[in-house]
Every structure is written in structure tokens, then in C-alpha cells.
Amino acid sequence: MPDKKTLWMLNELEGFEKPKIKLEQYATSSELAVSMMEMIDETIGFEGKKLIDIGCGCGMLMTTAATMYELETVLGVDIDDEALKICSRNLETAEVQDRCELLQADILDPESDLPRGTFDVAVINPPFGTKNNAGIDMQFVQIGLQMVRPGGSVFSLHKSSTRDYILKNAKKWDGVGAECCAEMRWQLPATYKFHKQKAVDIAVDLIHFKKLDS
């Protein structure tokens, strides 16, 4: 568990200034990010790992990981240049900017120049997918699996209500193992005008997708 000063700093990181609904932009809470990183460290060990944060947004996940652990490489990738500017400021606030890199890219574009097969672990808080964008969360996971080396891991957050569906679908992928390693709570504040409640408490799963050695 980070010390109180670190927890306070993470809690003060900037979120989206003008979140884009088409990108399903929601800021990950510092509490959720810390819990996620602790569980990942317990599962595979973070020290010396090469990490990629896919769809990093304002950088809560990558900033938390770089603050808590001695990682060899940390790369954040996002399509939104405005979010990446905020992410850059957050990395400076946490004083980890020298150990982190950012890349603007559309990960869903097959022609994007991405460093595939080079990371030990990918972390993702993907879009959950609306009725007009169903399945995008699993597309993010598949991109994550492309980014990690054989034997590497993808850790992704998904609504607990979709657990059976996700694990069932992952079984169809060759060379991939999947398990739910934690159920967590995400206190999601109202982000868009159509949100009626000030906050919603969502049950989310941290799913571990393992890219098996070939």
C-alpha cells in the first residue's frame, strides 16, 4: 500500500477536462488503480517489468504503476491528444515522467505502428461498449495480447455482470488463458449531462488474460 503522501498525490491527479462520450471516457479512481496494481503485483510481480497502458486516457493506471513499482519500461497509448496532454502533466506531478513514454495512436487501426510483442504486461480500463459499440472491450483485450510477449499478461477491467460471457469467449482464443482474479468496486461519478445520479457504484472484475508460451 502506498504511503499517505502518495495516495494524496494520486487522488489529486487531473481527470478529463471535456470527456468524449464517443470514446467512453471515464476517469479511473485512484483507489481502484491502487487496488488493481496491488493485485497485479501479487499475481505476477511488477519489478523490472515492461508495461503498456492501452487507452491510457489521463494516465491514472500507468502513473500509479510507475509510482508504486520499479518498472523497466512504461508506455501509455491513446488516440486522444487532449487526454495525453493531461496524462503528461500527471506524470510530471508524480515525478515519474523520466520513466514513462506516451504514444498517440488508434489501437484499433491495424496499420497503427505499435510495438507489438515487446511488453511483459498490459493494463487496460477499456470502454465497456454501448449498444452502438458492443464488443469493443474485447477488442482492446485482443490488442493487449498482441502487445505482450509469449508468457506475458493482460489485466483488464470489465463489468462483473459480463464475467461469464468474457471468460467463455476467451476460451475460444488459441494460446490464451483467462481467469477473474478480483472483484472490485468502482465509484463512478456523474461524467456526462445525461447522468442522473451524482455517482454510481459498479462491480467490476479484474480479468487476467495470459498469453501462453508458444
Curated annotation (Swiss-Prot):
Primary enzyme class: transferase
Family as reported in the entry's similarity comment: Belongs to the methyltransferase superfamily. PrmA family.
GO molecular function: nucleic acid binding; rRNA (adenine-N6-)-methyltransferase activity
Subunit organization: Heterodimer; heterodimerizes with TRMT112/C04H5.1.
InterPro entries in the cross-refs: DNA_methylase_N6_adenine_CS, rRNA_MeTrfase/Polyamine_Synth, SAM-dependent_MTases_sf, Small_mtfrase_dom
Function: Catalytic subunit of a heterodimer with TRMT112/C04H5.1, which specifically methylates the 6th position of adenine in position 1717 of 18S rRNA.
Protein name: rRNA N(6)-adenosine-methyltransferase metl-5
Alphabetical keyword list: Methyltransferase, S-adenosyl-L-methionine, Transferase
Species this chain originates from: Caenorhabditis elegans
Catalytic activity: adenosine in rRNA + S-adenosyl-L-methionine = N(6)-methyladenosine in rRNA + S-adenosyl-L-homocysteine + H(+)
Residues bound to S-adenosyl-L-methionine: Q25, T28, G55, C58, D78, D106, I107
Disruption phenotype: Worms are viable and do not display obvious developmental defects; they however exhibit significantly longer lifespan and heat resistance. Cells show reduced N6-methylation of adenine(1717) in 18S rRNA.
Keyword field contains Cytoplasm: no
Domain of life: Eukaryota
EC number(s) given by UniProt: 2.1.1.-
GO terms of biological process kind: positive regulation of translation in response to stress; rRNA base methylation; rRNA methylation
Pfam families in the record: MTS
